[in-house]
Amino acid sequence: MMQKRKEYLRKLMQKRDLDIILVFSDLNNYSYDTALNRVKPGLFHYYYITLREEGFLEIDYLVEELKFQTSLKIIPFKEDIPEISLAKLTKGLNVGIIGNAPFWHLKDIQNSIYDLNKESRNILLIKDDFEIDKIKSSAKEINNILKRFDSSKFIRKTEKEIGNFLSQAIMKNSEGLAFPVCVTSMKDIKQTTASFPSKRKISEKDIIVIDAGVVKEGFYSDCTRMYFLNYKEAEDNYIKLVNAHKRVISKIKPGLYLKEIVKLYKEELKKENLPEETLEIEDLGHSIGFYVHEHPMFYSSEQENIKLEENMIITLEPEIRFSEYRLRTEDMILVKEKSEVLTS
């Protein structure tokens, strides 16, 4: 799969009449590093690819560390002046750039520079068996943490205390948080189901939404669960939402258009007598794995021709509104003829 992704980049190079593509990675986002070479930057670096060769530009004091991860050629540079090595490597060449490279890194490149982020993102869509196994492990980790969470123990505790508790649990068996843990409770759930924890204390009658994910061996997960304290009406509606959600998942398969997922949710919500007209269709899901939020983020009209493909991994996170609260659940799904829920 990694070679297929590199061939895609080489074809893109020819299509755009480019001589070299630079792929920037840092510790905030190294999805392309993982997808193309299964390496992780020590701080930041560039992978480069031409029609005939490939390699890395790496900070001089991190070269030996990178050698443990790859046999490709490594060009060292000084951490504070990467622009000199980049200008030398690309002299006389038309350059494509992928990733969020700082402008000052590229300022000395003399020829044209083309942003390829939109055109390259498709190489992250399909995962191979190795990647699927790693993403499954990441998904299992966050699912188990949220399963073990006992909301009754946090009455009169703050959202921040819940967030800290979960963050510590995540850090025990993973590289870190996929994103800051979101904890939202009763007062704010009328407006949102994903917000940073506040000093608000959990009451005897309350609703708690937790949105969290882990990074494990470089692969990301994302999951949302709700917990109810003496609020039977909301809990009953949540059970109905989860039932509708499960039926939609059972219909997820390769070839399904993203726009059809919206239709499926509205049909299943209606069967449960839930307010299908309040479904938040613009925040219904996204691809995931190499990073927490990958293309496509759905659904919007510009994506109406996008189909699911086998071995995509997506989240589905239906959210609906009531007068006093919102409800949301979120799971990760491996797209197959019989799709698999990874967070269950």
Model feature map: region roles:
Residues 1-344:
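Active-site neighborhoods and metal-handling regions in enzymes and metal-associated proteins
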